Amino acid sequence: MNSHLEDLTTEKVNDDTVNIDVMNTEDMLKAINNEDIKVAYAVQKEIHNIVKAVDIVSEKLKNNGRLFYIGAGTSGRLGVLDASECPPTYGTNPELVQGIIAGGNEAILKAVEGAEDDEDMGRSIIKERNMTSKDVVIGITASGRTPFVIGAMKEARKNEIIAIGISNNKNSLINKNVDIKITPIVGPEVIMGSTRMKAGTAQKLVLNMITTAVMIKLGKVYGNLMIDLSLSNKKLIDRAVRIIEHATKVEKEKAMEYLKRANLKPKVAIVMIKTNTKSYEAERLLNMADGFVTKAIKLGSK
């Protein structure tokens, strides 16, 4: 599996940074920044494929499915990070979006030797998490050939589970084992083979796009405001108050009052204010509107 690494774009030498070891600090940072600029353009070229991923993921989640990120090393950590941000940002159940990293939680903080090379372990993850055709899996691997990820993708498709691949090399093995391919080609890294850099940045941008767009399509956003956030600390309560203020144009004190009356649910508070209803009626309108605030307000204004 590790043969012909030199054929991978991410493993090639970057001609623009061959002298980075003798550059002064400013030139060194400019060289890194010049490479980073290329990342967003590489992701932009893949938007048509990201659209496919967003549409299928949102459809699965609307129908009680789950989203799983599967990766190793940096790619695995990025999946875990993105998944862990969904509950506080969008008020989702931690089971809805899950990140799985080769080697388990221990690998989040330090490398677990050999974990990424175990294809059978990747296969077993599908059964361990009780994945079904209602779910969707996204495999993340810069090289496009990480055995742990490939094993998971193969097993997913074997069980009629939609598999999506995010990689940074053309014609890679993962692209032969997924239903949707997302392949931002970022070119050779600043430091040869250090895919935590441009490849990792590209992966993070793609994950940001997928979960953000999916949550919008699930009614977790009103305008560009996060209105389903979980209020687990003072900072988030303050943010929720500001969100209600902005969405309804009420004063801070009134926003806080309605937030309390809505049992600390910002979207309920917004609908209460916009439709001049009590919390139970706002909840009913939101249920009728499948959780979409704009639709709930229209229903309550009839």
From Swiss-Prot:
Statement: the UniProt record of this protein carries the keyword Transport: no
EC number: 4.2.1.126
Biological-process GO terms, alphabetical: amino sugar catabolic process; N-acetylmuramic acid catabolic process; peptidoglycan turnover
Record field: catalytic activity: N-acetyl-D-muramate 6-phosphate + H2O = N-acetyl-D-glucosamine 6-phosphate + (R)-lactate
Group of enzyme by EC: lyase
Source domain of life: Bacteria
Associated pathway: Amino-sugar metabolism; N-acetylmuramate degradation
GO molecular function, one term: carbohydrate derivative binding
Domain SIS: 57-220
Active site annotation, chain numbering: 85 (proton donor), 116
Signal peptide: none
Pfam family, one: GKRP-like_C
InterPro entries registered for this protein in UniProt: Etherase_MurQ, Glucokinase_regulatory_CS, MURQ/GCKR, SIS_dom, SIS_dom_sf
Keyword Lyase listed: yes
Alphabetical keyword list: Carbohydrate metabolism, Lyase
Similarity comment: Belongs to the GCKR-like family. MurNAc-6-P etherase subfamily.
Note: A lyase-type mechanism (elimination/hydration) is suggested for the cleavage of the lactyl ether bond of MurNAc 6-phosphate, with the formation of an alpha,beta-unsaturated aldehyde intermediate with (E)-stereochemistry, followed by the syn addition of water to give product.
Subunit (UniProt): Homodimer.
Biological function: Specifically catalyzes the cleavage of the D-lactyl ether substituent of MurNAc 6-phosphate, producing GlcNAc 6-phosphate and D-lactate.
Protein name: N-acetylmuramic acid 6-phosphate etherase
Taxonomic lineage: Bacteria, Bacillati, Bacillota, Clostridia, Eubacteriales
